[in-house]
């Protein structure tokens, strides 16, 4: 049961605007998110299904495309992210992986004191908490139901999507 309000469809490439999109993979209808959790039984998400179709922006000689692989179905972001159930801090493997990401960033980018480090989709700020205190840490997280972890660091969290306004 999908409605036009919940799911729209890609009309052109998100990067270059090319309208020539080739279907690469089609998967029959799936629940959009979190529907296996018992606490979500009465949630609207348990009633919304959509197929998953990957499309490729055609970059052949006949087209001016960029080759981006993208999802054809677009689910309304608030349905997916305003009440998000996963927390990075609860998973030991995720914590280790995020710590490794921070280590790699510090080795490659070599940020300096007071540099701004931004985490888009910061969840509970697990990743940002692995950075040294000398940086200015900023997170963007649209989920309204997540408590942010702040282990003695000044982390500025925007409870919204990353956008041009904030």
Give a label for each model feature.
Residues 136-141:
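Conserved SAM-binding motif I beta-strand of class I
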Residues 113-123:
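Conserved class I S-adenosyl-L-methionine
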Residues 143-145:
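Conserved SAM/SAH-binding beta-strand->alpha-helix loop
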Residues 95-114:
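Conserved alpha-helix/loop element of class I SAM-dependent methyltransferases that forms part
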Residues 124-134:
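Conserved SAM-binding loop of SAM-dependent methyltransferases across substrates and taxa
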Residues 2-91:
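N-terminal juxtadomain amphipathic helix
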Residues 153-165:
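Conserved SAM-binding strand-loop segment of SAM-dependent methyltransferases
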Residues 149-151:
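Conserved SAM-binding loop
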């Amino acid at each position: 049961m999908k409605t036009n309000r919940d799911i729209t469809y890609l009309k052109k490439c998100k990067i270059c605007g090319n309208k020539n999109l080739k279907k690469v993979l089609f998967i029959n209808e799936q629940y959009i998110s979190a529907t296996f959790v018992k606490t979500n039984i009465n949630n609207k998400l348990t009633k919304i299904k959509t197929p998953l179709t990957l499309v490729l922006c055609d970059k052949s000689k006949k087209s001016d495309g960029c080759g981006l692989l993208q999802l054809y179905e677009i689910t309304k972001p608030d349905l997916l992210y305003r009440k998000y159930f996963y927390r990075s801090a609860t998973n030991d493997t995720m914590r280790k992986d995020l710590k490794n990401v921070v280590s790699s960033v510090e080795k490659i980018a070599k940020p300096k004191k007071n540099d701004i480090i931004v985490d888009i989709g910061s969840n509970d700020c697990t990743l940002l908490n692995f950075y040294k205190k000398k940086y200015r840490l900023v997170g963007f997280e649209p989920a309204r139901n997540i408590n942010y972890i702040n282990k003695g660091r000044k982390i500025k969290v925007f409870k919204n999507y990353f956008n041009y306004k904030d």
